[in-house]
Design a protein with these regions (language model features):
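Conserved catalytic cores of phosphodiester-cleaving nucleases, focusing on short active-site segments
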Residues: 34, 79-95, 106
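Solvent-exposed, charged helical/coil patches
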Residues: 1-56, 125, 131-137
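A short acidic/basic microdomain associated with nuclease active sites
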Residues: 53-66
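A short, glycine/Asx- and small/polar-enriched loop/turn
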Residues: 54, 71-75
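Well-ordered beta-strand positions
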Residues: 58, 78-80, 119
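Nucleic-acid nuclease catalytic cores
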Residues: 90-137
Length: 137
């Protein structure tokens, strides 16, 4: 039963295995620390957790933002995992639509297909898997 469920998940979502590992790391961080800390504390703890799970990443990865082919600024991604997935962390009471829209805009700006929006600030870990519009799930 588990194998067929995993197959369905893998067929339905691109990079589901890697996003699942990242979410698992986030769950462990939230289990140990709970909510109530600043975002940077969760960033540091998640870096430790991903190192232990041998997940490669760059942290505070600066990326250029382009408009009509011209660079108009930069933005730092909390984590850029294995060159495939953007991970944006929050430490707020609850995620709102504006945070989801922001994550989707980052995917567009960085020409990336998949991202995770993670919130450590709620009593239970909140996470949203985001995909650039037009990517088939």
């Amino acid at each position: 039963m588990i194998e067929s469920l995993n197959t369905m998940i893998n067929e339905k979502y691109p990079q589901s295995e890697l996003t699942g590992k990242i979410i698992g790391c986030c769950m462990e961080v939230h289990r140990i620390l709970g909510n109530g800390f600043q975002e940077v504390i969760y960033q540091r703890a998640l870096a430790i957790e991903m190192n232990q799970k041998q997940i490669s990443y760059s942290r505070e990865h600066e990326m250029a933002i382009f408009y009509k082919g011209q660079e108009i600024g930069t933005r730092r991604v909390d984590f850029f995992v294995e060159g495939k997935i953007m991970v944006e962390l929050k430490a707020i009471i609850c995620l709102e639509d504006v945070h989801l829209a922001q994550a989707i805009n980052y995917l567009e700006a960085y020409s990336m297909d998949i991202g995770l929006l993670i919130n450590f600030g709620a009593r239970s870990l909140e996470f949203k898997r985001v995909m650039k519009p037009g990517i088939k799930s």
